């Protein structure tokens, strides 16, 4: 029994380690890189495909990847993208170079830059944007979630969990589903009352089609590539990561499902409300806890750690919705625009959809709904049920905290209004946490009235392109800055924005009032011009006019301001110097890249052969995560032998993934000694498999573990598919099209050696798909070998003849002549070899004489 128990414990531990390696939360890996030295001394390299696990909780300044080469740090860094992929950032040498929007990026966010606040300055602002709750409230939520777990289960986890599991658990604690759960209005109060910075900007430039992308005026964040927050329905592991497509030599992109041109809001589903540019934020429906921002019902699991829309189409989650407004504010906001309330609904792709007038403002979700109740735990509750709770039950979900968000009277009719504005005698300060909070316009008119019509404001609006072409627009006296529906001039708006950026705090209301009194021109405030003019002497007025006339001749602009009650012959002239006609400095443009230039490779001082490289990123929540790979330096005239892994080195595709991890040797007999003999003749080996990038460590460890007769497999770059685990398995096992990846990969490697001839000499595979891929890169059938699960080796040119790896090893000198002897006709032109061309013809035999 002890033996059985030890065996079961060993198997369980191995399976647990295997699952940990395949867990998407910690799935990281790096594909080996091949660098080819050219005749002229330059270098070419294959793409650097490096992927880290789910890092959606990282802030921008943490997404810097450090690189160590052969144990020494190098002056080269990468940046993390939206899906955990790493890429280099290259500054464009010329402004005329065209870069697709999907490849544009921001510079690497160094930790020492002043634009990125420290941890102590961030406070609750370090929470991602999607986590719409105060810092204390989020702590309370996590504590309540932990209290729902049995105590003995926590003790068991704390005892048996390794540091890697604890890191993965900490990551799942702060994963995207928790961030995207909407909160009631009271919980959003703290963020709505202060200017909170955004360290994570949802949605990257270049990931949206033109018809679905936001205009420059609608964005409140810099166009950064490394903060794309993507959520997709995960009803099955196969679709868990299938929404991201990552082809060889390219960056990952979102696999968008085809959507109809017009979207209709279905009954019983709440649509995401994204108001038009410049318009007020008026959601047409209130989104409860069971509806996601795209209007799709969400199944809430018992643990409360995952959100799954019912649809199977890949879905991109938008920014969190605004706090549901009261009926009074909705009517007032709609009235300002001259539109009836709830007359239109805006989908995420800015499609305007009419909503029936009889549609209720709040989606009805009864407690008796089977879909609603079957996912609720014993202590779970939907957010839209909170208003019906009494104060005692509400206190369970909103404990007292320093932020003052204790238990509220949800049952009172005026509770929501009091939660939104706990101090009605003070006007709430403007915030910058919504999409339409800030806009620029050259409409002017603040001297006449603070109320500028929306049509007039939009008619002279300033876009991002206008500001980049002429930054001097900020000095224009007609500039009007719109913040949360209120209009300010630049003298008032600049301190507000600067206070947010530098100190992450909003200016006090007293300071705002003082700025408005001193800096904001009012129509009734021009009286001081009159008494000032009464003190002017006649000679001073004439001197001022002469000075103004002289400056007008020099091309300077003047503006004449006069009040209604003054005489027309006594104007006051304010001198406004014109901007110098200089070309605004061009902002450097950066692009993503997966390859290094020849000069960058030369500075790495690579050794010939294998060079160990480690990619590491240090995060606040996960510590330091590392990915290991190898950079191989070859020459332009090296001859390469390609080898598949699954079914070629292993005996079968499926079991080749599993059995070696359980300690069983599942390798074909004789392949190790054959490959070793081929390597001794001067050939390089390249392993190409359609496995996912997350299995890089497992694959490399297996190839190093294989041994036969004291010989091990030759070292060589292991080229895997950069796509996700389930995408790679689906392509190889379900679709059975691994050649799609292999053709792209091998063609790219072939380009590194051109125009110096064909680098590939022979190839080993196990499927017709492998033969097809090898033919596409120019390999002749005489040097393409396939093996079946029984170990029978077949040469594609002579399919009727079957051999084995062991027999092929006996004639390796004939099929793989040593490269060290220099070029020969056998190697360069096999059709003119001694066997194919120069051999003596067979003598003619008369078959009749044999009878």
UniProtKB/Swiss-Prot annotation:
Task: Give GO MF terms, alphabetically.
Answer: phosphatidate phosphatase activity; transcription coactivator activity
Compartment(s): Nucleus
Q: Which InterPro entries match?
A: HAD-like_sf, LIPIN, Lipin_mid, Lipin_N, LNS2, LNS2/PITP
**Region span, C-LIP:** 590-792
Quote the biased-composition stretches of kind Basic and acidic residues, using this chain's numbering: 418-429, 542-559
**Where do we find the motif Nuclear localization signal here?**
141-148
First-listed, main subcellular location of the protein, grouped into a coarse class: nucleus
Low complexity bias locations = 268-286
**Cofactor(s) annotated in UniProt:** Mg(2+)
What does UniProt list under activity regulation?
Inhibited by N-ethylmaleimide.
Give the reactions, separated by semicolons, that this protein catalyses. a 1,2-diacyl-sn-glycero-3-phosphate + H2O = a 1,2-diacyl-sn-glycerol + phosphate
Per the record, the domain comment is: Contains 1 Asp-Xaa-Asp-Xaa-Thr (DXDXT) motif, a catalytic motif known to be essential for phosphatidate phosphatase activity. Contains one Leu-Xaa-Xaa-Ile-Leu (LXXIL) motif, a motif known to be a transcriptional binding motif.
Protein function: Magnesium-dependent phosphatidate phosphatase enzyme which catalyzes the conversion of phosphatidic acid to diacylglycerol during triglyceride, phosphatidylcholine and phosphatidylethanolamine biosynthesis therefore regulates fatty acid metabolism.
**Name used for this protein in its record:** Phosphatidate phosphatase LPIN3
Species of origin reads Homo sapiens (Human)
Give the lineage. Answer: Eukaryota, Metazoa, Chordata, Craniata, Vertebrata
- From the UniProt record, report the name of the gene that encodes this protein: LPIN3
């Amino acid at each position: 029994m002890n033996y059985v128990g030890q065996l079961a414990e060993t198997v369980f531990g191995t399976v647990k380690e295997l699952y940990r390696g395949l867990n998407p939360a910690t799935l990281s890996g790096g594909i080996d890189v091949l660098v080819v030295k050219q005749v002229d001394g330059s270098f070419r390299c294959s793409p650097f495909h490096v992927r880290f696990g789910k890092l959606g909780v990282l802030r921008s300044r943490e997404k810097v990847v450090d690189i160590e080469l052969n144990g020494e740090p190098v002056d080269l860094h990468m940046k993390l993208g939206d899906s955990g992929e790493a890429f280099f950032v290259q500054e464009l040498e010329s402004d005329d170079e065209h870069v697709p929007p999907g490849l544009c990026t921001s510079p690497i966010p160094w930790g020492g830059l002043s634009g990125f606040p420290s941890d102590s300055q961030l406070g609750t602002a370090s929470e991602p944007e999607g986590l719409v709750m105060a810092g204390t409230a989020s702590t309370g939520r996590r504590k309540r979630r932990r209290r729902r777990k049995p105590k003995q289960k926590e003790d068991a986890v704390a005892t048996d969990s390794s540091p890697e599991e604890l890191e993965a658990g900490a990551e799942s604690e702060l994963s995207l589903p928790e961030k995207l759960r909407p909160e009631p209005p009271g919980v959003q109060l703290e963020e709505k009352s202060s200017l909170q910075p955004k360290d994570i900007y949802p949605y990257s430039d270049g990931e949206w089609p033109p018809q679905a992308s936001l205009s420059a005026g609608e964005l409140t964040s810099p166009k950064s590539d490394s903060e794309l927050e993507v959520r997709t329905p995960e009803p099955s592991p196969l679709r868990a990561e299938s929404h991201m497509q990552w082809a060889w030599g390219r960056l990952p992109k979102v696999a968008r499902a085809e959507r109809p041109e017009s979207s209709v809001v279905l009954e019983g589903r709440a649509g995401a409300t994204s108001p038009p540019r410049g318009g007020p934020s008026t959601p047409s429906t209130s989104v409860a806890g069971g509806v996601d921002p795209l209007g799709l019902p969400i199944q809430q699991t018992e643990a409360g750690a995952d959100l799954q829309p019912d649809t199977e189409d890949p879905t991109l989650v938008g920014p969190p919705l605004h706090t549901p407004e009261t009926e009074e504010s909705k009517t007032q906001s709609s009235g300002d625009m001259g539109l009836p309330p709830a007359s239109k609904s805006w989908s995420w792709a800015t499609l305007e959809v009419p909503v029936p007038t009889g549609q209720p403002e709040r989606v009805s979700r009864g407690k008796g709904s089977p879909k609603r109740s079957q996912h609720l735990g014993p202590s779970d509750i939907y957010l839209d049920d909170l208003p019906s709770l009494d104060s005692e039950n509400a206190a369970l979900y909103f404990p007292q905290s320093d932020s003052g968000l204790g238990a509220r009277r949800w049952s009172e009719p005026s509770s929501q209004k009091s939660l939104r504005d706990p101090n009605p005698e003070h006007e709430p300060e403007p915030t910058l946490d919504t999409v339409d909070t800030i806009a620029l316009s050259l409409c002017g008119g603040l001297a006449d009235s603070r109320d500028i019509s929306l049509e007039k404001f939009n008619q002279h609006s300033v876009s991002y392109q206008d500001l980049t072409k002429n930054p001097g627009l900020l000095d224009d006296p007609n500039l009007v800055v719109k913040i949360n529906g209120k209009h300010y001039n630049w003298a008032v708006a600049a301190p507000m924005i600067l206070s947010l950026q530098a100190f992450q705090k909003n200016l006090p209301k007293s300071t705002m009032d003082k700025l408005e009194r001193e800096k904001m021109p009012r129509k009734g405030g021009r009286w001081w011009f009159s008494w000032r003019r009464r003190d002017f002497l006649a000679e001073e007025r004439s001197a001022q006019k002469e000075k103004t006339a002289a400056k007008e001749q020099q091309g300077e602009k003047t503006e004449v301001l006069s009040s209604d009650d003054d005489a027309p012959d006594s104007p006051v002239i304010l001198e406004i110097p014109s901007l110098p006609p200089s070309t605004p400095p061009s902002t450097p443009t950066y692009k993503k890249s997966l390859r290094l230039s020849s000069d960058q490779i030369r500075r790495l001082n690579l050794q010939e052969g294998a060079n160990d490289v480690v990619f590491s990123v240090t995060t606040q929540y996960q510590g330091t995560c590392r990915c290991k790979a190898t950079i191989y330096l070859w020459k332009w005239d090296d001859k390469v032998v390609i080898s598949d892994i699954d079914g070629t080195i292993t005996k079968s595709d499926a079991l080749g993934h599993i059995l070696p991890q359980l300690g069983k040797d599942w390798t074909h007999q004789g392949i190790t000694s054959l490959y070793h003999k081929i390597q001794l003749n001067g050939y390089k080996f390249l392993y190409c498999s359609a496995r996912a990038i997350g299995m890089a460590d497992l694959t490399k460890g297996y190839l190093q573990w294989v041994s036969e007769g004291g010989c091990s497999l030759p070292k060589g770059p292991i080229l895997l598919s950069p796509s996700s685990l389930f995408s790679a398995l689906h392509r190889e096992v379900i679709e059975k099209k691994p050649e799609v990846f292999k053709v792209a990969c091998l063609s790219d490697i072939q380009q590194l050696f051109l125009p110096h001839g064909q680098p590939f000499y022979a190839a080993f595979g196990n499927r017709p798909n492998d033969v097809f891929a090898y033919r596409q890169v120019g390999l002749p059938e005489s040097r393409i070998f396939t093996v079946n699960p029984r170990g029978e080796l077949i040469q594609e040119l002579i399919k009727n003849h079957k051999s084995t790896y062991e027999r092929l090893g006996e004639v390796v000198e004939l099929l793989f002549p040593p490269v060290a002897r220099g070029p020969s006709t056998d190697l360069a032109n096999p059709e003119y070899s001694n066997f194919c061309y120069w051999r003596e013809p067979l003598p003619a035999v008369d078959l009749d004489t044999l009878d």
